[in-house]
């Protein structure tokens, strides 16, 4: 167990070091869901939340493609946005079932296309009670020195919308 936690810490730390020792900024969204954490984690753990969000937001996401993998660590996922001229590609680098944490590192697109040197997306499913939890979505990012004056930021709205979609989907299926 200690080895797993140490490895996860090392992996996340290595990604943060990829920001060339720049200070990481964070955008965070939290949403309470009246469903147990295990049910929410089932949706977030692999590709379920990406597929559900694409299905529910066809005016935002044109399609999703799995470029590598099966939804586990190492999976590379590409989201193409409407009207199809922009995209975002990420690699799942941590999936921790015990802590219900999923981390993805941006590879291209998103804020990387407008001046960020690193973009790391993390989902934490935090149990509150047996039938309630919090979906915490966090984007950590660093801005390249030459773009600091422009203050580029990733957009957390899609992650917030995905959490709302998950909430509606899971709470309605509980009834």
What is the predicted role of each segment?
Residues 103-161:
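Beta-strand/loop substructures that line and gate deep hydrophobic ligand-binding cavities in soluble
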Residues 2-70:
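Hydrophobic ligand-binding cavity/cleft-lining segments
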Residues 40-44, 77, 92, 104, ...:
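Hydrophobic pocket/interface hotspot
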Residues 48, 160-175:
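Short amphipathic alpha-helical signal-transduction/dimerization elements
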Residues 24-30, 61, 74-76, 87, ...:
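Intrinsic-disorder/low-complexity, polar/charged segments enriched in Ser/Thr/Lys/Arg/Asp/Glu/Gln
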Residues 51-55, 61-112, 173:
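Glycine-rich portal/gate segments that line the openings of hydrophobic small-molecule binding cavities
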Residues 29-31, 88-94, 118-127:
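Hydrophobic/aromatic beta-strand elements that line small-molecule binding cavities or substrate pockets
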Residues 37-38, 69, 93-101, 124-134:
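A short, structured loop/turn motif at beta-sheet edges
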């Amino acid at each position: 167990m200690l080895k797993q936690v140490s490895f996860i810490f090392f992996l996340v730390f290595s990604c943060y070091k990829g920001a060339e020792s720049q200070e990481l900024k964070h955008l965070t969204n939290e949403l309470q869901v009246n469903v147990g954490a295990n049910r929410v984690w089932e949706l977030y753990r692999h590709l379920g939340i990406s597929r559900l969000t694409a299905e529910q937001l066809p005016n935002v996401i044109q399609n999703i493609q799995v470029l590598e993998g099966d939804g586990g660590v190492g999976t590379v996922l590409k989201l193409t946005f409407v009207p199809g001229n922009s995209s975002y590609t990420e690699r799942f680098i941590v999936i921790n079932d015990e802590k219900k944490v999923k981390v993805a590192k941006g590879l291209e697109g998103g804020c990387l296309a407008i001046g960020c040197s690193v973009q790391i997306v993390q989902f934490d499913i935090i149990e509150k009670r047996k039938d309630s939890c919090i979906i915490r979505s966090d984007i950590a990012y660093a801005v390249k020195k030459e773009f600091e004056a422009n203050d580029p930021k990733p957009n957390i709205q899609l992650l917030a919308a995905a959490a709302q979609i998950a909430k509606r989907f899971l709470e309605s299926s509980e009834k």
